[in-house]
Design a protein with these regions (language model features):
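Active-site-adjacent loop/helix micro-motif of nuclease/hydrolase catalytic cores
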Residues: 96-99, 114-119, 126-138
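Interdomain/boundary linker segments immediately adjacent to catalytic/signaling cores
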Residues: 1-85
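Hydrophobic/aromatic beta-strand patches that form the interior of the parallel beta-sheet core
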Residues: 69, 121, 150-152
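Residue-level detector of flexible, active-site-proximal loop/helix-junction positions
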Residues: 75, 127, 156-158
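Residues at the C-termini of beta-strands that transition into short coil/loop
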Residues: 72, 124, 153-155
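Active-site metal-binding core of divalent-cation-utilizing nuclease and nuclease-like domains
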Residues: 46, 71-112
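Domain-level recognition of nuclease-like catalytic cores that cleave nucleotide substrates
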Residues: 44, 48-58, 131-174
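Conserved catalytic cores of phosphodiester-cleaving nucleases, focusing on short active-site segments
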Residues: 61, 104-109, 114-127
């Protein structure tokens, strides 16, 4: 997009409303997108909170004797196969997140010689899965990739945040 066009668009945005409350960014095709600054900050805080809770869940699983690793694959429901997860990135600066697979973690625990429990763990602060996430969980369980899938949910006890694990089979596959 030409510099004159960007200036003209920015001028029109300023004329239309309060430009101090909005931030305009440009996508790959040069199309402007305006966002409220308050919502940008709220998204940043939510991502940071989610990342902190993810670390807490990982530490908790490791304390319970499981070997935990970030799951870097996803399910393509149309093809019915596992595919590498796509990276999320900001085209103007850097890679934002690398591990965007579903579920978040794979946790392995040795039961006895030659037998292991392999579970998938999806971390959600509110414990709610979308319809697509539920379909992916069902697919993983039907194909026998994971023996169980747990949903790690944040539970408040006063100021302290605890972790509650919900078994996907028990809650959704009755």
């Amino acid at each position: 997009m030409k510099k004159e066009n960007k200036k003209e668009i920015m001028k029109r945005i300023e004329e239309a409303g309060d430009s101090s409350n909005y931030e305009t960014s440009w996508d790959n095709e040069g199309i402007p997108k305006s966002k409220e600054k308050a919502k940008i900050k709220m998204g940043r805080v939510s991502r940071a909170t989610g990342a902190r809770f993810e670390l807490k869940v990982r530490k908790d699983l490791e304390e319970k004797g499981r070997i935990v690793d970030k799951w870097s694959n996803n399910v393509d429901l149309e093809k019915g196969e596992i595919v590498p997860a796509k990276r999320k990135f900001n085209p103007f600066s850097r890679v934002m997140t690398i591990g965007t697979g579903f579920p978040d973690f794979v946790a392995i625990k040795k039961i006895h010689e030659g037998t292991y429990s392999v579970i998938g763990v999806e971390v959600k602060i509110n414990g709610t899965l979308s319809r697509e996430e539920k379909e992916k969980c069902s697919w993983y369980l039907d194909k026998g990739i994971f023996s169980e899938i747990w949903i790690a949910k944040a539970v408040r006890d006063g100021r302290k945040i605890g972790i509650e694990y919900i078994d996907f089979k028990e809650k959704f596959m009755k």
